[in-house]
Amino acid sequence: MQGSSLWLSLTFRSARVLSRARFFEWQSPGLPNTAAMENGTGPYGEERPREVQETTVTEGAAKIAFPSANEVFYNPVQEFNRDLTCAVITEFARIQLGAKGIQIKVPGEKDTQKVVVDLSEQEEEKVELKESENLASGDQPRTAAVGEICEEGLHVLEGLAASGLRSIRFALEVPGLRSVVANDASTRAVDLIRRNVQLNDVAHLVQPSQADARMLMYQHQRVSERFDVIDLDPYGSPATFLDAAVQAVSEGGLLCVTCTDMAVLAGNSGETCYSKYGAMALKSRACHEMALRIVLHSLDLRANCYQRFVVPLLSISADFYVRVFVRVFTGQAKVKASASKQALVFQCVGCGAFHLQRLGKASGVPSGRAKFSAACGPPVTPECEHCGQRHQLGGPMWAEPIHDLDFVGRVLEAVSANPGRFHTSERIRGVLSVITEELPDVPLYYTLDQLSSTIHCNTPSLLQLRSALLHADFRVSLSHACKNAVKTDAPASALWDIMRCWEKECPVKRERLSETSPAFRILSVEPRLQANFTIREDANPSSRQRGLKRFQANPEANWGPRPRARPGGKAADEAMEERRRLLQNKRKEPPEDVAQRAARLKTFPCKRFKEGTCQRGDQCCYSHSPPTPRVSADAAPDCPETSNQTPPGPGAAAGPGID
């Protein structure tokens, strides 16, 4: 048996060698295989390296080469994100190294540095200056400059580096760094990172790494190996990285997280939001701020599992993403207070009024320690007290302040003192100025168009509504997340009283309102609060008076997210255009034009004509013709079709009485 098996094996091997020899004999070395060349291989079957065109991009102090094909992700829209991150990490390094007696030097900053910005003044140059502290005689200050290794500096990780642009910018623009780990799971991306590191001469600071970001962070859980700064900017949701991130960041370290899955966080898929972030998102006008608070809740919830908690420094909603900067601390006593920092949201589906219900209750005791217990609720009745509609339940979400205004002021002051440092400095100043004006203890907001559309009245101006709230002794502010937001500590009843008073100046035709509509029920109640719409000087915020760039319009076409990076992918612009072409005319029902809509509406009888109240006559978009009587099958004659009936055929309309 063994001999026969060996003989069969040798026979098959000889047959393969013979067939291969015949193939190469037929494929003459002098004649290249044109079919193989067309398929992307060499003339004799070997694989040829695919020619990839590369593009060089200069952003900040970095110069990056990346392939034009969509193999490595790069989005120029995120320049504001990267500029803001550099500014935040710089101030964080100033705080951390300042405690060690190390001063950082930022190119463009003067010896006298601004430390306080007086936002109450209209002149943007009116800033308080503070001289640097005098050192003791004979002492030499320790300094840290950009591009140099600081042995006591920050250990930074960029978990999803792609082309390495962000990490290289950290090395070239942020002082006080010990090392920067630029990690990515893609081999193509890591090769590009190595090339860009050599191109910018930052190999002494930036360390390329190829690994799964989660496993890399899990391997740095030890206190001595943790990172001082972790930056996560994934394509889509960062939910799968948060558990590892809260364990790998050092005590008091900085965690920078970007979420670009705004469709999920804004309430389009509440069940998906719950599976990723542990909270139900609601469709509301305040969805962008609620998205920020859901991300903060998710971070704090994951940190609590390891006796850690988060302290938000800055939370931004911009363009198509949200970005949060938090510090992570350890403390069992502080973790107990986390439940009282979260809240559920009861939102009326009719008028949009919302109420918050805290998950926990913290009360003080004579000994000085806080006592925690379950909260009592709910804060609403089954039906809305304003319009009688039902409530939707969302959350939990972070209900505490989402910004550290002192830290925001430091970043704003540094950017204002050195406007040439970033390309988007003007926008950073505008957004941070609005943030400093926000009410820190008031979650969520209403919008002008929401309030007016609910009762079908004209929209008051921003200054008129803000003045009415200020005259009623309520606080009011804008929100960086929405340009027509009204963030106020006034209850919903006071807001609707103000809108009732406004409606009296611009009356609504009550006969057009349904008795069950929110507008009818709200306007049927007389206001208890008499609103005063006289414009007040303090109703116009300082950032608006100074004309800062607070809410940037899209500067170019296709301003938004880019396609995901794919191996061997097409150029980003080409891929987007092909996607648009493939999706054209793929709707279930093509949009109808004006004539088609008018013809369709004419098939419906006019209800007001039946009641005798329609005054439009022939101009009415609905039909005034009497309904055609239906002919039952029993009453139909048995005679054949007459000559005046239309014979059936293509495009023939159905006769009277036929459904």
Curated annotation (Swiss-Prot):
Outcome following mutation: residue 530 to N/A/K: Abolished cleavage by coronavirus SARS-CoV-2 proteinase nsp5
C3H1-type zinc finger span: 600-627
Alphabetized GO MF terms: RNA binding; tRNA (guanine(26)-N2)-dimethyltransferase activity; tRNA binding; zinc ion binding
InterPro entries associated with the record: SAM-dependent_MTases_sf (IPR029063), Trm1 (IPR002905), tRNA_met_Trm1_C (IPR042296), Znf_CCCH (IPR000571), Znf_CCCH_sf (IPR036855)
Outcome following mutation: residue 348 to R: Abolished tRNA guanine-dimethyltransferase activity
Keyword Nucleotide-binding: no
Enzyme class of the recorded protein, top EC level: transferase
SUPFAM superfamilies: CCCH zinc finger, S-adenosyl-L-methionine-dependent methyltransferases
Residues of the transit peptide: 1-23
Residue ranges of the region described as Disordered: 537-578, 616-659
Residues annotated for S-adenosyl-L-methionine binding in this entry: 82, 166, 184
Family: Belongs to the class I-like SAM-binding methyltransferase superfamily. Trm1 family.
Disease cited in the entry: Intellectual developmental disorder, autosomal recessive 68: A form of intellectual disability, a disorder characterized by significantly below average general intellectual functioning associated with impairments in adaptive behavior and manifested during the developmental period.
Protein name: tRNA (guanine(26)-N(2))-dimethyltransferase
Gene name per UniProt: TRMT1
